[in-house]
Structures are given as structure tokens and as C-alpha cells.
């Protein structure tokens, strides 16, 4: 697993990556399929398959409220681009989407087939404002995406769910 942080004068961004010992199509499907995603990552439930132009909802049991996710681009077995609200200290205590940051970040996931039916998954997120809240939110999301990669690996390679109890 690699973690790379970059800071520019305009925004905050990061990139995390990890290798999964499964074929690229299987790994890709575990991300775009809401039933699979709900088993290891969006433990409060995911609604909607990731397809270009769709808006889906992700809910995390540890964080109240559902998060709307705009699917900007899906290239089968290669790339997923998402946009969602930056969530700078925004919290929801209802079933309504989290709102409050008034700007969005962009998440780019890339899937690369490796030898031996392995897959390199790289996740980058960018677009936070250079504020203390933006910095905290970017660090929190970096932790979240790193956790997602670990959970994805454990789920696909060993059939176990790591997320339960990790954050709360």
C-alpha cells in the first residue's frame, strides 16, 4: 500500500494505492456493484450501480446520513471518476444527504491489471479548499480511502469484513 500526499497553493489532494490478488474485472465489479460495495465498505448500504451520469447514494454505518455521489465517468475495468460534497464538518443526523460544504471534490479510481491475475487500484481525491476544515476533511477521506482498499483486499481475497468496528 502506498500513500502520497500533495499540496499546492490552490487545493489539497492525495493518492493511495494497493494491490489486490484478484483479476481486474472482479475487483472493478466489487466497486461498481452496490451489493458488493455494501458488504465491505458502505456498511450502511449503497444504492445504485456506478454508471456514467448516475447519482448514487452511499451510507456508512459509522457516520450518520447518506452521501449522494455523482458518477462522472466509468470506463469498464479501468477507471471511475466520482464527485461528492467536500463535507467540511457537515454532519447529518437524518436520512437526508450530508450537505453544507457548498463545493465538491473529485475522486478518481484507476484499475490496472498486473501479472498473476492481480490488480493495482489507485484512488486519488482532490479539490478541498485550503482551510483548516478542508485540510481535516482531506485527511479524513485519505484515511477512509486507505481503509476502503484494505477492506476491499480482505473481502475479495479472504471473504472477511474489516470495516465493522473500525471507526466506532
State where each predicted segment sits.
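A short, structured loop/turn motif at beta-sheet edges
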Residues: 24-25, 72-79, 110-120
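Short beta-edge strand/loop motif at the mouth of beta-sheet-based domains
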Residues: 15-16, 35-70, 75-79, 164-167
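Short beta-strand segments that buttress and anchor functional surface loops
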Residues: 55-61, 82-86, 95-98
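Beta-strand/loop substructures that line and gate deep hydrophobic ligand-binding cavities in soluble
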Residues: 91-147
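Short, highly charged C-terminal tails/helix-capping segments
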Residues: 154-168
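Hydrophobic pocket/interface hotspot
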Residues: 27-28, 37, 56, 71, ...
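Hydrophobic ligand-binding cavity/cleft-lining segments
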Residues: 1-47
